[in-house]
Amino acid sequence: MAQQSIIDTVVNLCKRRGLVYPCGEIYGGTRSAWDYGPLGVELKENIKRQWWRTMVTSRPDVVGVDTSVILPRQVWVTSGHVEVFTDPLVESLHTHKRYRADHLLEAYEEKHGHPPANGLADINDPETGQPGKWTEPKAFSGLLKTFLGPVDDEEGLHYLRPETAQGIFVNFKNVMNSSRMKPPFGIANIGKSFRNEITPGNFIFRTREFEQMEMEFFVKPGEDEEWHQHWIDARHQWYIDLGVNPDNLRLYEHPQEKLSHYSKRTVDIEYAFNFANSKWGELEGIANRTDYDLRVHSEGSGEDLSYFDQETGERWIPYVIEPAAGLGRAMMVFLMDAYHEDEAPNSKGGVDKRVVLKLDRRLAPVKVAVLPLSKKPELSGPAEKLAAELRQFWNVEYDTSGAIGRRYRRQDEIGTPFCVTVDFDTLEDNAVTVRERDTMEQIRVPLDELQGYLAQQLIGC
């Protein structure tokens, strides 16, 4: 199946099965804003859990924080965001729709293999295909404003954070002292960020409200390049370990002229989304932010954010390596890469098309489905009891509606690794049938061994 059609199919599946809904749909919705349904919440939490385990709890040199969405306004002035967190905005004179000029230029270069000789004049209107007629680019702030207090005035002006990183930097000294950490060490944060995107879109890929998984790793100057490469490799491998096909991933080195104001070097992990105007899209960025952030916040706040190395007697401002991932983008990648269609036998002796999400078991929203073969009390009673017992350990779904094959299909398309069928033989042999999602193989497991069997199969879940 072509990748673009996979996007459309996955979007349809997400809406139909309750992973993602359009925000405020009964009122017409908000463009590129999404609510996460019951299964979507579970998938998101599982992704966050795996990220946190890998980046924080499995390491002795990283700790976590949860910082405020609304920071003092001076944080964003000092960091440079108020001045430079802008995008070039242009308007089509054909449709009067607005676009980011850099996105138009990048899409042209990716399609043609070279930048447009005459700049925007060579770029056709994306909607109508007419020869390009554009306004002059204007700076457009990506910061979302809000006001604190009873009056909407300059004194109450604040910003919703466009990244979680600054909350980490301003807490650097607090964390270092209270946790008795010293470089090299990291501080991680998962939370909501907000950006006033000009052209949000592509499902949950680019939205104005999004969730980030970021870690700032503080190192001694001179050791930054080695640590940067370490985190590039580690983050790339994380996606592969959770089931993403490495052929669908690539590393993209930012050209020097396109680096952010704080960056010495940035490498993106990109995924082959195959959007209409671009094959590759950023999944995660790993940046060498140098000592920029701690240095400017030391100057702006008057607080010394340097580190005194007792072993060498030197004082220095740490460099920062930042792996920054978007949770929505990660979720989109895991869904697209897990989506498969194959065939499965039906009750009539033929075969049906089967949609299956071959999600890594650690990510699957539901781990086990308990399915009584019949609604009769002699089966439904023990099945309900079994489901209640298994819920103490995993997210379990209980389903009695429809033929057993149809119920298997429902679980396959949401990625449930195991279906446990309670049948009439269970009443005689105290065993159940366990079906594995990907192979569709079925084995008989005694009830008193079921929990242990599933625990072995669901390690890390």
Curated annotation (Swiss-Prot):
Q: What is this protein called?
A: Glycine--tRNA ligase
Q: Where does substrate bind?
A: 100, 163, 210-214, 322-326
- What does the similarity note say? Belongs to the class-II aminoacyl-tRNA synthetase family.
Q: Name one GO cellular component term.
A: cytoplasm
EC primary class: ligase
Q: Which domain of life is it from?
A: Bacteria
Query: What is the protein's species of origin?
Result: Corynebacterium efficiens (strain DSM 44549 / YS-314 / AJ 12310 / JCM 11189 / NBRC 100395)
Instruction: Say what the protein does.
Output: Catalyzes the attachment of glycine to tRNA(Gly).
Q: Which NCBIfam families match?
A: glyS_dimeric, PRK04173.1
- InterPro entries (alphabetical): aa-tRNA-synt_IIb, aa-tRNA-synth_II, aa-tRNA-synth_II/BPL/LPL, Anticodon-bd, Anticodon-bd_dom_sf, Gly-tRNA_synthase/POLG2, Gly_tRNA_ligase_bac, GlyRS-like_core
Instruction: State the reactions this protein catalyses.
Output: tRNA(Gly) + glycine + ATP = glycyl-tRNA(Gly) + AMP + diphosphate
Q: Which HAMAP family match?
A: Gly_tRNA_synth_B (MF_00253_B)
Where is it predominantly found? Answer: cytoplasm
Q: How does it assemble?
A: Homodimer.
User: What keywords were assigned to this record?
Assistant: Aminoacyl-tRNA synthetase, ATP-binding, Cytoplasm, Ligase, Nucleotide-binding, Protein biosynthesis
Which positions in this protein are listed as binding ATP?
Answer: 195-197, 205-210, 282-283, 326-329
In terms of PROSITE patterns, this protein maps to:
AA_TRNA_LIGASE_II (PS50862)
Which is an annotated Pfam family here? Answer: HGTP_anticodon
This entry's Enzyme Commission designation comes to: 6.1.1.14
- Mitochondrion among keywords: no
Q: Which GO terms describe its molecular function?
A: ATP binding; glycine-tRNA ligase activity; protein dimerization activity
Q: Where in the cell is it found?
A: Cytoplasm
The record's listing under CDD domains reads: GlyRS-like_core (cd00774), GlyRS_anticodon (cd00858)
